[in-house]
Structure formats: C-alpha cells, structure tokens
Amino acid sequence: MIEADRLISAGTTLPEDVADRAIRPKLLEEYVGQPQVRSQMEIFIKAAKLRGDALDHLLIFGPPGLGKTTLANIVANEMGVNLRTTSGPVLEKAGDLAAMLTNLEPHDVLFIDEIHRLSPVVEEVLYPAMEDYQLDIIIGEGPAARSIKIDLPPFTLIGATTRAGSLTSPLRDRFGIVQRLEFYQVPDLQYIVSRSARFMGLEMSDDGALEVARRARGTPRIANRLLRRVRDFAEVKHDGTISADIAAQALDMLNVDAEGFDYMDRKLLLAVIDKFFGGPVGLDNLAAAIGEERETIEDVLEPYLIQQGFLQRTPRGRMATTRAWNHFGITPPEMP
C-alpha cells in the first residue's frame, strides 16, 4: 500500500518512530497542544486520586499520529499505576482479553489501540468487565457448559481509535470520558520540534523549527520524522546546524512542499485540475487517472486535502477548490 511508502503519512509507524518514545512527554505539565483535553484530564485525574478511585474509562479518538498512545502513558504516570498495552487485532479470542484483565492490579490502566477492530466475541467479554468489574467465563461445552463470574480489581480501560464511528454503540456508551484529539497548531508543533531537537543534541534555530512545523500536516509524528530527515541533510550537506534555509532545502529535496503535500497529494490535485477541469470527477475515474486504488484515495490521500480545504466531496464527485488552483499558480475558471 502506498501509505507505507510516504514520509508524511501518520498512519504508519516506522521503526525509527519507536525511538520517539524517549522524547515523549510523561506528565500533563509536559504535554503540548490539545488545551481542552489537557485541562479536562487534569481535573478528572485529580478528582479520581482525591477519591482513591480508578479513573473512569477513557476513549481517545482522532487522526493518526496525534499522541493517543502518549496520552495513555501520561494518564498512567499521573495516576501512579501500571500501563498494560495491547491492540484490537491482537485480542483474537475471549481468553486473550481475560488473561490481561485477570493480571491487572487495582487502578491499573489497560490500553487497547485500534479498539474499533475488536472482534464481537472479545467485545462481549469487555462489557461486564467495564461496567461491573466482573469477568463472565463459560466453562465446558454443550449441555455441561456453565458460566462463572470472576471479580476484577477496579481498572481504567483506555481505548484509542482513528475511527470512532466504527465503534458499536454498547462499547462507546461504556466510556465515561471521551476525548477527541485535533490537528496541532503550528506554534505547538514548533515547540515540539525544538524540544525534539534538544533531545537529539541538534543545533536548530527557531526559524528552522518553524519551517519543519509548517510542513508537518499538524501531526507530531510527522514533525519528528521530518526533523530526522532534515538532520541527515544538515549533517551531510552542511555543518549540522539547522536554519530555516537548510530545513527548506531538505524538505524541498524530499518533495514536501510548504503545505506539507508530497508527490502523491500534488498528483491527485493536478489530475482533478488538468484532466477534469477542476471537477466534479467520480472516484473511479480519478483512481484510473492517477493509477491508484479507490480505497487508497479515500483512506490515504483525500482526508488531509479535504480537511485543509483543497479538495471537496460533492454528490457529483470530487472538485478542486479555489485554494487548490491558487496553490499551483493556476487561475481558476470563472463560475458561470
């Protein structure tokens, strides 16, 4: 799939992204951006600690790369408890989830990434565990089968998903706290890039960090990934110091433009503009024009372009906006 090959794709985690764990914030006071989420979580965590309770179950959703796993780690650290991590696709059988739940200590946090991908069988086991801190297990088969209940310690389930709409209503309704992560503002990303540069021992100007932040598509994961590539360029082509000019040269070399678009983003927009006169164009025709699967366009290429106002979905098909025409220096046609 094309997503795995794109430097500016937040949906894939590259091996080098794992190294970012060392520079991730560990407490709320270190957490940058998402001011509403931060202020609310500070209150919820303090209240739970004052009562001596486990934090209520928490659902975190939003685009990939915005720090859902980081926030789960922060919650566990702030509560002073253990964090157990797994993901929806890994929990194939009810017994897999039961094994994790029975090993939790009081108030521990169980983090399930991609929770929308839980199988129905596993999800059924989760309901009484979340609601009553009980595990219902069926022993035996057929007429001899019987159900036993196992009491669980109070715990916090944190579910993370990029597709909140794919969650079933019974599961979604059992989360007492729901937080949506938004794309980051450029000043917050600039701070994150500068902080990462310090951790990496890099000499980087404020303008250099700003240049990387502007092209990071509002996503910390992409910002840190671009920073590593800019570092490589600065060390090989210059003296290792990262200025705005060096950052711009490096990112231009990587085909990441001022809007954070790469070759595939530009290819799609130019196809709509040049081949279909700005649209509307049907998804199948557009897929054929750029030689990509329609699923790739829908899931990988389109979302950011639509969010930033460069592409529009209409009942008749995709249309390039005036902003897209202006981005390429092309005069849009006059509206009839």
From Swiss-Prot:
One BP annotation, GO: DNA repair
UniProt EC number: 3.6.4.-
Pfam families on file: AAA_lid_4, RuvB_C, RuvB_N
Region (Large ATPase domain (RuvB-L)): 4-184
Matching InterPro entries: AAA+_ATPase (IPR003593), AAA_lid_4 (IPR041445), DNA_helicase_Holl-junc_RuvB (IPR004605), P-loop_NTPase (IPR027417), RuvB-like_N (IPR008824), RuvB_C (IPR008823), WH-like_DNA-bd_sf (IPR036388), WH_DNA-bd_sf (IPR036390)
Residues annotated as signal peptide: none
Top class in the EC scheme: hydrolase
Gene Ontology MF term list: ATP binding; ATP hydrolysis activity; four-way junction DNA binding; four-way junction helicase activity
Stretch list, region Small ATPAse domain (RuvB-S): 185-255
Binding site for Mg(2+): 69
Predominant localisation class: cytoplasm
Location of the region described as Head domain (RuvB-H) in the Swiss-Prot/TrEMBL record: 258-336
Subcellular location: Cytoplasm
Catalytic activity: ATP + H2O = ADP + phosphate + H(+)
Keywords: ATP-binding, Cytoplasm, DNA damage, DNA recombination, DNA repair, DNA-binding, Hydrolase, Nucleotide-binding
Binding-site positions, DNA: 294, 313, 318
Top-rank taxon: Bacteria
Annotated Gene3D superfamilies: 1.10.8.60, P-loop containing nucleotide triphosphate hydrolases, Winged helix-like DNA-binding domain superfamily/Winged helix DNA-binding domain
Annotated binding of ATP, by residue: 23-24, 65, 68-70, 131-133, 174, 184, 221
One GO cellular component term noted in the UniProt record for this chain: cytoplasm
Biological role: The RuvA-RuvB-RuvC complex processes Holliday junction (HJ) DNA during genetic recombination and DNA repair, while the RuvA-RuvB complex plays an important role in the rescue of blocked DNA replication forks via replication fork reversal (RFR). RuvA specifically binds to HJ cruciform DNA, conferring on it an open structure. The RuvB hexamer acts as an ATP-dependent pump, pulling dsDNA into and through the RuvAB complex. RuvB forms 2 homohexamers on either side of HJ DNA bound by 1 or 2 RuvA tetramers; 4 subunits per hexamer contact DNA at a time.
Record remark on domains: Has 3 domains, the large (RuvB-L) and small ATPase (RuvB-S) domains and the C-terminal head (RuvB-H) domain. The head domain binds DNA, while the ATPase domains jointly bind ATP, ADP or are empty depending on the state of the subunit in the translocation cycle. During a single DNA translocation step the structure of each domain remains the same, but their relative positions change.
Family from the record: Belongs to the RuvB family.
Subunit structure: Homohexamer. Forms an RuvA(8)-RuvB(12)-Holliday junction (HJ) complex. HJ DNA is sandwiched between 2 RuvA tetramers; dsDNA enters through RuvA and exits via RuvB. An RuvB hexamer assembles on each DNA strand where it exits the tetramer. Each RuvB hexamer is contacted by two RuvA subunits (via domain III) on 2 adjacent RuvB subunits; this complex drives branch migration. In the full resolvosome a probable DNA-RuvA(4)-RuvB(12)-RuvC(2) complex forms which resolves the HJ.
Protein name listed in UniProt: Holliday junction branch migration complex subunit RuvB
